[in-house]
Amino acid sequence: MGRTLENKQQIVTEIKSLLNDSEMAVVLDYKGLTIKEMSDLRSRLRTTNGICRVTKNSLMRKAIDGDSNWNDLESLLTGTNAFVLIKEDVGGAVKAIQSFQKDTKKSETKGALFEGRLLSDSEIKEIASLPSKEVLMAKIAGALNGVATKIAISINEVPSGLARSLKQHSEKSES
């Protein structure tokens, strides 16, 4: 039995909501994957705040219609597609997808869309090599802390240096 029009509209609304919350979408050809393998992919993505949805291309087409951020996804809507929608840890999610593909050797990436732009395979691999947002923030915080420490030491050194100079000058004057 097919889906009702109301059910299809509900699915399209849900997909639109997921897309609005997502930073990146990766389209995978899931042909040949078992339910167990799809569950494995979903569990790997869960830790990176990614969602894997299998939906009809026609419903995805309706969900992206008129949305300038996701319109370019249209060119990838052929064949059997699983859509990985990534909310936050883009690099971690892409790493999880690549790890899954390496382990199963069944799925392949058709393409990805990030900030309204289609990405090439090499760009997708580059994203996977990036550190997570938390690691980058920690590096920035460390760098800022280092600068603040150096400034504090420098500021503290000016009066200390002046005091030493005055002391040396007074000792010379006394002798």
UniProtKB/Swiss-Prot annotation:
Signal peptide: none annotated. Keywords: Ribonucleoprotein, Ribosomal protein, RNA-binding, rRNA-binding. The keyword Transit peptide does not apply. GO terms for molecular function: large ribosomal subunit rRNA binding. One of its GO terms (cellular component) is ribosome. Coiled coil: none annotated. The keyword ATP-binding does not apply. InterPro entries: Ribosomal_uL10, Ribosomal_uL10-like_sf, Ribosomal_uL10_bac, Ribosomal_uL10_bac_type. One of its GO terms (biological process) is translation. HAMAP family: Ribosomal_uL10. Belongs to the universal ribosomal protein uL10 family. NCBIfam families: PRK00099.1-1 (NF000955). Forms part of the ribosomal stalk, playing a central role in the interaction of the ribosome with GTP-bound translation factors. Part of the ribosomal stalk of the 50S ribosomal subunit. The N-terminus interacts with L11 and the large rRNA to form the base of the stalk. The C-terminus forms an elongated spine to which L12 dimers bind in a sequential fashion forming a multimeric L10(L12)X complex. This is Large ribosomal subunit protein uL10. It comes from Prochlorococcus marinus (strain MIT 9215).
